[in-house]
């Protein structure tokens, strides 16, 4: 079996739909099958997966932490679209400084990137799958 290189695009919010959780399950399965997950690009409402201020109920799956653990264990880039993130209040430390904000809330392990990063992934990965 040949292994493939993947990038996932997640458009669904962290808890507003099943999209992000399904993407996480797909990511885990493809890694388990020996494929390489290069990056996950969070776009539109999907950028909410990258806020460190998400606090699910005690009996709920903590999706942001799950993404962080997956990224750390398997060297996966977690990228939030910077424009979509800023519109939705998900702000990195550098963006907070640039815009004169006192606080930032981008979770550890996530970075902010532009659409150029997604375009590059579409050109270089074997598969790009959108959720």
Swiss-Prot record:
GO terms for cellular component: sulfurtransferase complex. Keywords: Cytoplasm, Transferase. It is found in: Cytoplasm. The keyword Transferase applies. GO terms for molecular function: sulfur carrier activity; sulfurtransferase activity. InterPro entries: DsrEFH-like, Sulphur_relay_DsrE/F-like, Sulphur_relay_TusD/DsrE. The active site is at residue 81. It holds the Pfam family DsrE. GO terms for biological process: tRNA wobble position uridine thiolation. It comes from the Bacteria. Its EC number is 2.8.1.-. Could be part of a sulfur-relay system. Belongs to the DsrE/TusD family. This is Sulfurtransferase TusD homolog.
